[in-house]
């Protein structure tokens, strides 16, 4: 009789191999066959011009759009630690030009957080984080990005993205994958700065409000009813 644990382990190994090997080419096809629009990118350029480190924040459901729209820039990104999907993201990210830090709030979080702080102490660092990832709850910021910004003086630039043609996969959120031959819009929001004296509740509310409003705008732009 087959051992279910061994079967799951073999399945996970196959998925990691398949995703890491073919994922970059598949994502390039899905996303590079779309027309791209970048809205209000001056917000990001202004943040870069400030000389301070930057945290790019987006909801988890838009991860792939932000991931592909900002690839090839040698930016940093955060993936989970020991989950197969995190390993796939890490391998794909490396091939697409991202420098991936492994860890999450529940798995290797302290080590990853300290590494993020070290990276953000470099003034030219750009680090992408999904504040509600990797396991939700959806659209509720966890402390990591906010605390890191407070500790290092990093500017948080909210970003939302959506495609006019897409698939949606519902789990704890609705995770979007662009279909080929549509139009993808990546929209940047007004940068946020949080002092160390600011309460987490106030910072969290400000970040959530910004990301929710940005998501609603980009969804309206591509003709998608917001799932807020």
Enumerate the language-model features and the residues they cover.
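A short, well-structured juxtamembrane/interface segment
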Residues: 28-53, 62-65
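Non-catalytic C-terminal accessory region of glycerolipid acyltransferases
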Residues: 2-28, 45, 71-75, 95, ...
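Conserved beta-strand termini and adjacent loop/short-helix elements that scaffold enzyme active sites
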Residues: 39-41, 80, 103-106, 189, ...
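Short, flexible loop segments at the rims of nucleotide/cofactor-binding pockets, characterized by
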Residues: 31-36, 55, 103-108, 134-135
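Generic structural signal for residues in well-ordered beta-strands
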Residues: 36-38, 100, 186
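Catalytic core of membrane glycerolipid acyltransferases/transacylases, capturing the structured
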Residues: 52-107
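Short, well-ordered turn and helix-capping elements at secondary-structure junctions
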Residues: 40-42, 60, 104, 133, ...
């Amino acid at each position: 009789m087959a051992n279910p644990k061994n079967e799951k382990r073999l399945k996970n190994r196959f998925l990691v191999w398949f995703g890491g090997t073919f994922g970059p080419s598949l994502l390039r096809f899905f996303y590079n066959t779309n027309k791209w629009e970048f809205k209000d990118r001056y917000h990001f350029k202004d943040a870069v011009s400030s000389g301070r480190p930057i945290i790019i924040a987006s909801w988890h459901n838009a991860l792939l759009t932000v991931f592909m729209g900002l690839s090839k820039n040698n930016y940093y990104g955060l993936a989970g630690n020991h989950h197969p999907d995190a390993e796939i993201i890490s391998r794909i990210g490396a091939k697409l030009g991202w420098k991936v830090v492994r860890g999450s709030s529940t798995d290797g979080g302290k080590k990853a957080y300290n590494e993020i702080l070290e990276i953000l102490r470099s003034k030219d660092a750009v680090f992408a984080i999904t504040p509600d990832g990797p396991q939700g709850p959806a659209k509720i910021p966890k402390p990591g990005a906010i605390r890191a910004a407070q500790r290092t003086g990093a500017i948080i630039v909210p970003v939302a993205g959506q495609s006019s043609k897409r698939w949606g996969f519902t789990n704890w959120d609705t995770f979007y994958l662009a279909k080929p031959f549509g139009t993808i819009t990546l929209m940047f929001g007004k940068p946020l700065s949080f002092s160390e004296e600011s309460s987490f509740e106030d910072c969290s509310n400000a970040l959530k409000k910004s990301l929710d409003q940005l998501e609603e705008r980009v969804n309206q732009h591509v003709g998608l009813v917001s799932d807020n």
